[in-house]
Amino acid sequence: MAVEDEAGHAARTAEQKNNPVELVQRCGHRGLTLSTAESLTAGALTSKIAEVPGASAVLLGGVVAYSVGVKRSLLDVSDQLLQDRGAVDPDVAAAMAVGAATRCGTDIGVSTTGVAGPEPHEGKDVGTVYLGLACSVEVVQRLGLTLPAECAEYDDDVSRRKWLAGSLLLDLDGDRAAIRDAAVEGGLKLVEDFLLTEPPGLPHSG
């Protein structure tokens, strides 16, 4: 699966804070639910979304998958993929997002995996972050949405739903805390951008 490397996305997330209220409102107006799978951000993205009053109607759950074993056992990421590529990989990020959505029973899954530092990891430089996004095929088609990367299709044998999932590469600067914060902002921006299509009756923001 090809990965879209958006320098502009990384720059925006470093320069401005994204408002999780917008994300929750957009999901709520569409009747969509969201779940998370976090590695380097370790629950910070979930916590940021949960700060919004009424987020419980949208945010159903999240998995902190810091270890490879948890990515495999709780998010159903392929053991072969993890062995071949390591945890910091575009396809792993996409699979994590699918795993979050299927495990939590949501329409959308978003994930984070990367190297926060201070040392490189698995041959990946500090600041290398992949964000994953997954959405059910039915929702994508019904709302006319477009994922921000070339996607692969995944099947879920349990729910019988089909998923589209892709990933986004961020090349971030700063210390460990700055990289983790920017990854959280990037995750919020990724979902917000995905939901930019305005359904009938939803007022435009700004």
Q: Predicted segment positions?
A:
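Short alpha-helical segments enriched in small residues
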Residues: 1-206
